[in-house]
């Protein structure tokens, strides 16, 4: 394809835990892929005070988990494309992804964009992990 086109086996949208895991697995399986997302990875993970339910990493802070994700991506030579995808179209035998004037073709698309958050209330961010929680069953024991 030309300068404004690129072809991949897999296009991955999202740089949270699911998108990162998909990219690592694509690399291990020698698939051609592109990872779209934020170079800062997951803001939701970053804001998490303590994550207690991630396999093999009990009691890890969100910022430390993001740091480890970034190190793993670097070790695997996985780059993040920061272009925002504005459309995904099923063309039949492949998918066409649009990002501004650029087009990307992929045999498969993995949408790993996470859950939509609601607007924060005043003081929420400052009190996260100090009484404010997003998981009652996970964090109830702390309060």
Predicted segments — roles?
Residues 1-11, 80-143:
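FAD-binding core/adjacent interface of flavoenzyme oxidoreductases
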Residues 16-17, 40, 115-116:
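Residue-level detector of alpha-helix initiation sites
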Residues 23-25, 47, 121-125:
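Short amphipathic alpha-helical segments
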Residues 3, 46-103:
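N-terminal Rossmann-like dinucleotide/flavin-binding domain of flavoprotein oxidoreductases
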Residues 15, 38, 137:
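Cofactor-binding loop segments of dinucleotide-utilizing enzymes, especially the Rossmann-like FAD-
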Residues 29-30, 51-52, 126-129:
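Glycine-rich, phosphate-binding/catalytic loops in enzymes
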Residues 28-47:
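Glycine-rich FAD pyrophosphate-binding loop
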Residues 9-34:
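N-terminal Rossmann-like FAD-binding beta1-loop-alpha1 element of flavoenzymes
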């Amino acid at each position: 394809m030309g300068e404004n086109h690129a072809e991949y086996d897999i296009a991955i949208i999202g740089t949270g835990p699911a998108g990162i895991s998909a990219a690592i697995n694509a690399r291990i399986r020698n698939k051609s892929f592109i990872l779209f997302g934020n170079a800062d990875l997951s803001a939701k993970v970053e804001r998490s005070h303590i994550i207690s339910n991630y396999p093999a990493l009990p009691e890890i802070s969100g910022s430390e988990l993001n740091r480890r994700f970034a190190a793993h991506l670097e070790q695997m030579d996985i780059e993040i494309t920061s272009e925002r995808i504005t459309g995904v179209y099923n063309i039949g035998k492949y998918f066409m992804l649009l990002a501004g004037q650029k087009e990307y073709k992929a045999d498969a698309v993995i949408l790993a964009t996470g859950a939509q958050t609601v607007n924060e209330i005043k003081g929420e961010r400052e009190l996260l992990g100090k009484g404010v929680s997003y998981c009652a069953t996970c964090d109830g024991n702390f309060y």
